[in-house]
UniProtKB/Swiss-Prot annotation:
Its EC number is 1.7.1.7. The gene is guaC. It comes from the Bacteria. One of its GO terms (molecular function) is GMP reductase activity. It is an enzyme of class 1 (oxidoreductase). GO terms for biological process: purine nucleotide metabolic process. It catalyses: IMP + NH4(+) + NADP(+) = GMP + NADPH + 2 H(+). This is GMP reductase. SMART domains: IMPDH (SM01240).
Amino acid sequence: MEIFDYDNILLLPRKCRVESRSECDASVELGGRSFRIPAVPANMKTVVDESICTWLAQNGYFYVMHRFDLDNVQFVREMQGKGCFASISLGVKKPDYDTVDRFVAEGLCPEYITIDIAHGHADSVKNMIGYLKEKLPRSFVIAGNVGTPEAVIDLENWGADATKVGIGPGKVCITKLKTGFGTGGWQLSALKWCARVATKPIIADGGIRSHGDIAKSVRFGATMVMIGSLFAGHEESPGQTVEENGQRFKEYYGSASDFNKGEYKHVEGKRILEPVKGLLANTLIEMEQDVQSSISYSGGKKLMDIRKVNYVILGGDNAGEHLLM
């Protein structure tokens, strides 16, 4: 098995078939809807809030609302009342089951539900998937997070409509340091490994440091890429604004950090300051254009044409050109 990550892989270009990158279609389908780009902001308190999710939905982007200090039922009611799709996160505790029961009682059904726990290959996730499929069968269920083919196979067999791959590769995640487990440092290999057995969409979660990493994720099997740090630190971001030496920053912390949990127990995340990047809309436009450029370099016109290219591994035991077989 080849071990590599985003920073030591490059994709090999093929003959360009377009006059301009604007001819390339960066859109992707997930759960019966088409979205402008294969990227989604991480469902974290310092990345998304109600207003950002509304804007994303109204402008053709996928979103997943976080599950912290939030009335999910009210959120779904308000989003659907605005004519937007509703995409929420749930855990696997009793309050999460109670939330599902409230949806049923009120005749509400979120279009997307992400079961969002740090170690998603678990009986607790199996049970929640089963409950959702029984009570809210029209919801598109994303389950995670996982990092092995066995986990992907199990989640799909349990009824998940998509799986989220990535354990601890994120910029503010310290799972690998705290536990010794995870996909940090080899997230792209883990994605490739998991995608080989997947029959349903994979969302690659974590480890993205640049827009080119989106194309690399698609090449190795991702349908959608969840990103935290690149989407944090915008003017609209919900994180607290901090000024140091005349420069403005936004706080950004992991979902399992003591800042998010409000207590120093079972901490697997940290807090950092992200320089304020400007407006989120501008970043999304740039991201879409960069993905379009990636498609043009792949010799194609559609997003999934990126999966046809060869690649090279830079340095290490696996270095060299790897042809698509």
